[in-house]
Amino acid sequence: MRTAVVVGSLCMATDLGMALPFGHGLGSTVVAMRLADRLGVDQATTVQTYYGCLLFYAGCTADADVQADLFPDGLAEHWTAVMFASQRKSMAGVFRALGSGDGGRIVRTVRAAAKFPRAGRGYKHHTEALCEVAEMVATGVGLPRTVSGLFRLLTERWDGSGPLGRAAGADLPLAIRIVHVARDASFQCLLRGPAAAVEVVRGRAGGAFDPSVVDALSVDMVEGSTDWARAMAAEPEPHLMLGGAQIDDALTTFAAFADLADVIGHSSAVADLVGQAAKHLGRADDEVSVVRRAALVQDLGKVGVPFRIWHQDVAPSADDWEKIRLHPYYTERALSGSPYFAELARVASRHHERLDGSGYHRGLSGSELDLPARLLAAADAYCSTIEARPGRPALTGAVAAGKLRAAANAGTLDPDAVAAVLDAAGHRPERIVRPDGLTPREEQTLTLLAHGLATKQIGRALGVTAKTADHYVQQVYAKIGVSTRAAAAVYAVKHGLATDATREFPR
């Protein structure tokens, strides 16, 4: 399979996470490739530009819990248009986003002022997490180091005023400079049309943007296409390819990216369980692979739902539920560009459907739901029950089994699928080999860290002081080679260390 197919599908999901129109990232990439061609860049820079632009927002789910608290209505509406503007205008956009919500202008201003100091203190950390997660995602989907290494410089600016201060001017890779101009030009085109977009970008030359790249931009280049085929055709040759286990690794990265928005490790846990359940039913290897891979991508659409909904301690409102019910549709839509992912998208988008037609998002029933969809629905329901969620503790496996049997008796879940899932859940093998030399205690620390616990909470869970817990955390960071909790969570998912969500963690 072409790597571009995998990365392009993930790009569609990042459009969701940034509240952009579907296909915007594809169109931006077409613009970036036109710029690269006009500048006459070398082959290596062309490859970097293509994949760097597709995955520009790959870190958008980093620190989703913090984003949910600070920006309950999202950041994109107020910030994306000014992210490459002057520092003053960019911060003004952040301030407006902090104050978004109910109330008049005075209420919103007071709300923003109350949050602004905390947002300022956490800004550098969030930026580091964004870059680190994007780099890990790029690596996870099979891109070479020459591409994934770009993402640590994702937020830098030509004039050196980037928040991390890692590069400026000609030290900033040319591919990043091209991507920045292409992404902003494409977004400005959405707001005001091609000619005005080019004028806005020209006004940012010498600030965020390399003047020589801006000089190469013209109105005809900005009219990008959101067509999947055109974006795939823009991929530099020779095409990068993925096969076999590499595809599974890439889809596990999809799972980690999606789960950062809600419950860390959920999709991987469902994939492990439903794969075992399918084997228990004697399904062929290719059928097992399809349902397992579908589980890994089933919640990709969650990134299109405001993060506050997944992290609030109160029951969702009627309006919230309408948004929640859309996430399987978003999953299907994000995967719809590629014929290869068509079967995965079909199964994945049905994990909340029920036999009696009471599920969502299509309200399918009975014969409209095949065995893979029925297995996935049962496995997802089981894993959701044994995971701690905002507003409720994790329930035991016994309680989860009782709930699934009751659902089967009521005709909402398939009895055979429920039996297979429960059989698989009762015979899950323990993992013995520990990655990167982590001790059992460090594994525990990483699991707690991945589930969002602060240092004091980790200490309480492990029965140690906060100082000792912090020591464990730093040891974990050093061994796995990361520096932020979001990146640690991605690592935990990849190595199967985030799925132990069967207990209620101390808050």
Can you annotate each of these PLM segments?
Residues R431-Q474, K479, K494-H495, T499-D500, ...:
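Helix-turn-helix DNA-binding segment
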Residues M1-G437, E443, T499:
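Histidine- and acidic-residue-rich, metal-dependent catalytic cores
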Residues S336, A478-V493:
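Short, Lys/Arg-enriched C-terminal cap helix and immediately downstream tail that follows
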Residues V179, L376, L446-A450, Y477, ...:
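Hydrophobic residues on short alpha-helical segments
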Residues F56, Q298, H471-A478, V490:
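Base-recognition residues in the alpha-helical recognition helix of bacterial helix-turn-helix
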Residues A216, D272, A420, L448, ...:
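A ubiquitous, low-specificity "background" feature that marks scattered single residues
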